[in-house]
Amino acid sequence: MIASWGKRLIDWLNTYTFPEEMRFDHPAYAAEISARYLDLTAAHGTTTMASFCTIHPTSVEALFTEAAKRGQRIVAGKTCMDRNAPEGLRDTAQTSYDESKALLEKWHGVGRLSYAITPRFSPTSTPEQLEALGVLWAENPDCLMQTHLSEQVDEIAWVKDLFPNARDYLDTYEAFGLLGERGVYGHAIHLEPREIDRLKDVDAALVHCPTSNTFIGSGLFDMAGLKARGVSTGLATDTGGGSSFSMLRTMAAAYEVAQLNGSVLHAGQLLWLATAGSAKSLHLSDKIGTLEVGMEADIAILDLASTAAIAQRYNNATHHWDRIFPTLMMGDDRAIAEVWIGGAKQILS
């Protein structure tokens, strides 16, 4: 469903996402797509992913099984929805708790695998489901909790209708124990001052998804403003809702969004966001994100002259950042020379 034409977030979910997610109830299909997903992300130089699986436990089993075969580090969880989704894509407060708990107990901490408690977003969960998942997180505080926050203005209005007593969108999570240091909140474009204060207070992580935010017309993430407020931020492709598997393309989009917001991201800042910054957001800074001695050897080696246009800029550069920047702006999978995962060189497809 990547790069599927759509009008707005809810339209896109109903037209493309939900019908595709229905198919993951079938183990063979879930296994096929899991393998293809890991092949495509590796080919674009990505070695660690945080993924929303579907509501089906089979989808989580398939992704973790395939990642374990490859020795790959991955964070994933069963998406939980008990309303405002089609028949066949809804669970209940109790089944979301029970199935998430069973998957967590089976997979979390096995090899390089981590489980994330995963309510899709407030509109598709009843208060009862959010409460149940908050209880599960409290019982397993070493897990991440991942969800979406304040992606589009009309989505926020919908949240206000569904949760009339909530102070704001973030409060629909906070009220049920789903705000914390190990919380990871995607998009977070249209935040209220109170929300920013609370995210900073608990040291939660926001995830900037520039390709999907522009692709679906959600808005411009205020990287500079949030950085000035001390809010932790990572960078992600949001593959299903975006237009590319490439973190290089995502870095270029982040640069462009910053420019539209009146700020400039240096090449070093972009690389940090895609590596150490994102590792920090996933609480994996002690394992991945840098080339320091003792870190896990997840490495992407870039060809800084992968196309004629990039090579021309590279050959005329006089400073190392000037040699790197063209690849960040114009690079794609052709710029990925080698990928190593867990110290093993990958055969790229």
Predicted regions: what is each one?
Residues 191-204, 209-215:
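Long hydrophobic segments that form regular secondary structure
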Residues 1-30, 71, 78-93, 152-182, ...:
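Active-site gating loops and adjacent loop-to-helix segments of metal-dependent hydrolytic enzymes
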Residues 2-72, 96-109:
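Alpha-helical scaffold segments that flank or form the walls of functional sites
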Residues 45, 67, 117, 148, ...:
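Divalent metal-coordination and catalytic microenvironments
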